[in-house]
Amino acid sequence: MTEQLNTSQKRAVILLSGGLDSATVVAMARAEGYACYTMSFDYGQRSHAELHAAARVARDLGVVEHKVIGLNLNGMGGSALTDTSIDIPEELGEGIPVTYVPARNTVFLSLALGWAEVLGARDIFIGVNAVDYSGYPDCRPEFIESFERMANLATKAGVEGNGFRIQAPLQNLSKAQIVQAGVKLGVDYGLTVSCYQADDDGRACGKCDSCRLRAEGFAAAGISDPTRYF
């Protein structure tokens, strides 16, 4: 998917999973005047519905190019999202959840960084937010800040003074605030899929942590959730 590019426009690479948060981030970057290049990953996750959702969102929000990178993270295992022998939990537990994928955001941001350097983009957007902090170590502000420092040490562009910024505009927002922001920016949340185990038609289980957080966010925002359930 490639749209017409205004060559004078600043460029951004945006991690797009196909879920609520990343779709909102694409809309935010677009509203800030960026030419948006989105990157998704087929990494061996349980549900491929999110990849179809990412393509729909990219098309609807008019990104310049949408790229899907294939990775075999399920070959390593270690997560309920990539290993079907590990059950998706239906209750919140203590500590880091089994839905944590080892080093996932580090890997994803590294590949986004490579594409950004090729494109001459200086901004990389990711949809991590306050809801994720307690459970996922690679969603914390300290991680984002550290990755940005690394990006500017480890790249030709960074060494030559054309530094990168890792932008996490949802970092201090609740799920309700994210939904409200997206609605104002015209995000069609009916195109998105948040469920960890959505079926091939994108219908959600309504039981996993991601489904519950999404439903609670829409309810708190006072906005109808367009999620379909199986």
From Swiss-Prot:
Pathway it works in: Purine metabolism; 7-cyano-7-deazaguanine biosynthesis
MF annotations from Gene Ontology: ATP binding; ligase activity, forming carbon-nitrogen bonds; zinc ion binding
Membrane-crossing segments per the record: none
Official protein name in the record: 7-cyano-7-deazaguanine synthase
EC number: 6.3.4.20
Organism the protein comes from: Pseudomonas fluorescens (strain Pf0-1)
SUPFAM superfamilies per the UniProt record, alphabetical: Adenine nucleotide alpha hydrolases-like
InterPro entries named among the record's database cross-references: QueC, Rossmann-like_a/b/a_fold
Family that this chain belongs to: Belongs to the QueC family.
GO term, biological process aspect, one: queuosine biosynthetic process
Organism ancestry: Bacteria, Pseudomonadati, Pseudomonadota, Gammaproteobacteria, Pseudomonadales
Note on cofactor: Binds 1 zinc ion per subunit.
Function: Catalyzes the ATP-dependent conversion of 7-carboxy-7-deazaguanine (CDG) to 7-cyano-7-deazaguanine (preQ(0)).
Swiss-Prot/TrEMBL keywords: ATP-binding, Ligase, Metal-binding, Nucleotide-binding, Queuosine biosynthesis, Zinc
